[in-house]
Amino acid sequence: MGTVHARSLEPLPASGPDFGALGEEAEFVEVEPEAKQEILENKDVVVQHVHFDGLGRTKDDIIMYEIRDVFKAKNLIEVMRKSHEAREKLLRLGIFRQVDVLIDTCQGDDALPNGLDVTFEVTELRRLTGSYNTMVGNNEGSMVLGLKLPNLLGRAEKVTFQFSYGTKETSYGLSFFKPQPGNFDRNFSVNLYKVTGQFPWSSLRETDRGVSAEYSFPTWKTSHTVKWEGVWRELGCLSRVASFAVRKESGHSLKSSLSHSMVIDSRNSSILPKRGALLKVNQELAGYTGGDVSFLKEDFELQLNKQLILDTVFSASLWGGMLVPMGDKPSSIADRFYLGGPTSVRGFSMHSVGPQSEGDYLGGEAYWAGGLHLYTPLPFRPGQGGFGELFRTHFFLNAGNLCNLNYGEGPKAHIRKLAECIRWSYGAGIVLRLGNIARLELNYCVPMGVQRGDRICDGVQFGAGIRFL
């Protein structure tokens, strides 16, 4: 994606300062010596000018926020470090295809003996980019068309449109994203969408047409998202043999909800971490801003990771949640929690744990799930240092429960009910990390604590996703 160049400067000593981990895109500093060089690496320097080559529709003010720290550098090492950091910030905006940095001695009548000029050579993304692909899954084929307008108004705004035309369903989504200048983590987005989901474990089809607006911002070591969503939901039966409980849920509803999520994440990787912790807490309040659906929903996710000897990693995770209906109406099948499957309590079929009617799983208003995991390198370390590092041997123990609570009873009764009829499983398998995108698991599972009505997957189970218990 580019290189930091230093011109008319002596090469850095081999024992020079450590730049730290500069990211996957960082490259070695390229030094181009010239005649009559002046040794500046150990002297104070002043960044007199910062130039940009290649700017078109990008506004100057948003650029100045990203490169202002370059002027604060006091020596050559700081200039090079802060120039690299500014380059990373510019790339993060998502408006440049390439960013190169050139550091040169200052020229001109106002040039100081220790003055430097920093030049950013940038290549902007095109005004319109597109993608086209096909997807096959769940006995359905679909064509997906995507369009993106990056840097729409010159300040890193982005408009994205995605249209999916399938043999069974058609979906679309339109979104507008705008970051705050100088603070990319503080951003605002608006989404308009229509999406259809099929849930065979419940014999249910759900079509959502909605609009949402959300604001994300960091505070100290946490990140927060505040969101409003208004959605028109249409529920229908997926098959003619759907249970009466599912048929009773069919029809239209309007949900207007306010939600807040807080995340504290110190993990070194979100897909297969070796160290660090994650805490995620979500709250959703529906009905206060309108609609005919009213509830209060709380859930959390906790994960701890510790690297042991011989590149072995121990991981512990805990999920939990509760849904409290408000008013006279019971909770909807579309809002309840579901449990079971290769990404939660392994050894059970997808979302096939807990309350059910005639083979259709109805979800629950309260749940918990926990897991203990041990990840080790492959035996004999094949492909060590290369492709083999993407694989891990996996040993696990999972447990959890899903049920409905009587909110007229006290907390002790709720805890007692959640502690009854615990489903649990253990097993071993292989994990494949697909970069920082997703991970695949192939496990041999032994389900235990099976209750009447649960659907199990005894033996080999395959899972793919980004969020695992």
From Swiss-Prot:
<comment type="subunit">
    <text>Associates with the mitochondrial contact site and cristae organizing system (MICOS) complex, composed of at least MICOS10/MIC10, CHCHD3/MIC19, CHCHD6/MIC25, APOOL/MIC27, IMMT/MIC60, APOO/MIC23/MIC26 and QIL1/MIC13. This complex was also known under the names MINOS or MitOS complex. The MICOS complex associates with mitochondrial outer membrane proteins SAMM50, MTX1 and MTX2 (together described as components of the mitochondrial outer membrane sorting assembly machinery (SAM) complex) and DNAJC11, mitochondrial inner membrane protein TMEM11 and with HSPA9.</text>
</comment>
<keyword id="KW-0496">Mitochondrion</keyword>
<keyword id="KW-0472">Membrane</keyword>
<keyword id="KW-0963">Cytoplasm</keyword>
<dbReference type="InterPro" id="IPR039910">
    <property type="entry name" value="D15-like"/>
</dbReference>
<dbReference type="InterPro" id="IPR034746">
    <property type="entry name" value="POTRA"/>
</dbReference>
<keyword id="KW-0488">Methylation</keyword>
<feature type="modified residue" description="N6-methyllysine">
    <location>
        <position position="255"/>
    </location>
</feature>
<comment type="function">
    <text>Plays a crucial role in the maintenance of the structure of mitochondrial cristae and the proper assembly of the mitochondrial respiratory chain complexes. Required for the assembly of TOMM40 into the TOM complex.</text>
</comment>
<dbReference type="GO" id="GO:0005741">
    <property type="term" value="C:mitochondrial outer membrane"/>
</dbReference>
<dbReference type="InterPro" id="IPR000184">
    <property type="entry name" value="Bac_surfAg_D15"/>
</dbReference>
<dbReference type="Pfam" id="PF01103">
    <property type="entry name" value="Omp85"/>
</dbReference>
<comment type="similarity">
    <text>Belongs to the SAM50/omp85 family.</text>
</comment>
<dbReference type="GO" id="GO:0042407">
    <property type="term" value="P:cristae formation"/>
</dbReference>
<dbReference type="GO" id="GO:0045040">
    <property type="term" value="P:protein insertion into mitochondrial outer membrane"/>
</dbReference>
<dbReference type="GO" id="GO:0033108">
    <property type="term" value="P:mitochondrial respiratory chain complex assembly"/>
</dbReference>
<keyword id="KW-0812">Transmembrane</keyword>
<keyword id="KW-1000">Mitochondrion outer membrane</keyword>
<protein>
    <recommendedName>
        <fullName>Sorting and assembly machinery component 50 homolog</fullName>
    </recommendedName>
</protein>
<keyword id="KW-1134">Transmembrane beta strand</keyword>
<feature type="domain" description="POTRA">
    <location>
        <begin position="45"/>
        <end position="125"/>
    </location>
</feature>
